[in-house]
Amino acid sequence: MRNPIADKCAEIKPSGIRKFFDIVSEMKDAISLGVGEPDFDTPWHIRDEGIYSLEKGRTFYTSNAGLKELKMEICNYLKRKQGITYDYNNEVLVTVGGSEAIDIAMRAMINPGEEVLIPQPSYVSYEPCAILADAKPVIINLKAENEFRLTARELRDTITDKTKLLVLPFPNNPTGAIMERKDLEEIAEVIIEKDIYVLSDEIYSELTYKGEHVSIASLPGMQERTILINGFSKAYAMTGWRLGYACGPSEIIKQMTKIHQFAIMCAPTTSQYAAVEALKNGDEDVKEMRTAYNQRRRFLMNAFKEMGLECFEPYGAFYVFPCIKEFGMTSDEFATRFLEEEKVAVVPGTAFGDSGEGFLRISYAYSLENLKVAIGRLERFVNKLRAEQKK
């Protein structure tokens, strides 16, 4: 029988994130610190708007690109937060989560064999999306000594005449790294000089703890070269509503909308009405959640310091990325033993690329109470490993 599976699909490996949670779900008294999902409920006023839209019978398709009201609020939000002006008619597309936006942006822009530069460690979807778009993914291995930021030198050294697109995943999952304005200005200079485009994944833009997030699209000469990706899952605790958006040059958004039209039709109508409310009246909710995340972040950093576990200070998202190289085992081995012996699930850094070897992703999108119990178990485990090394 003929093989029914496409080669490029068979080439893609399943996400390394899920492995440990299939185990932990069956384990009594286990704690998971691995899922990148807010532990907060969607704020009630946002839920109410979704409920109200259902009660009013707003259950039909929207336009392919999304509700006019939502696209206008997205433009207002980006103008208010980043000082960027977009035309809601031609430069905004509402998608089923930020993940869909990443996928269709690559498919709309990349010709077979063109290169997509992907800094790693980073979100697991970028490389598979590039492969499915018939692109050649080129990995830029970020360094711990640079706090996992992308440098202009690393970018310049990687660009070839086949390079079309740079993925810029900051604030970063899994490291929590951010790019400050000066970093972005140096990157932008290379982008313009080399005449390539940027896919800027800014899904964690509201979750920064060292000043306001800066979008590369806000820098001179960059809006016309940037596809800005964002959404509602992380900032507004709306993961299950599955809603994101892309903003960028009209000719790119037009082609993305074409793919979206044939594959999806439109994003969920109920979710779109709820998102309008989130953008209009959700600032205080975001502030409260960000304050709670920051408290947890500080707790973890202090705990790592006390147990002598090396970890650079992350200023974005809701992850820490401690180094476990001192123990002489791989990230996967450490995570496996930690789960088996202490019943705590974390994610090996290698789930996010080879440069994540020797690190773990720990999410603090969990209650402080859970974090305290988990850190107690981590300290016990670390002390056990150090005792083993002395024998």
Question: What are the language-model segments listed below?
Answer:
Residues R2-I5, A10-K13, I23-M27, I31, ...:
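PLP-dependent class I/II
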Residues F20, E49, G57-F60, E73-R80:
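Glycine-rich loop-to-alpha-helix module at the N-terminal edge of alpha/beta enzyme cores
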Residues L70-I74, G97:
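Conserved AMP-binding/adenylate-forming core of the ANL superfamily
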Residues F60-Y61, Y204:
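Intrinsically disordered, tyrosine-centered linear signaling motifs in cytosolic regions
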Residues A65-G66:
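Short beta-strand to alpha-helix junction loop
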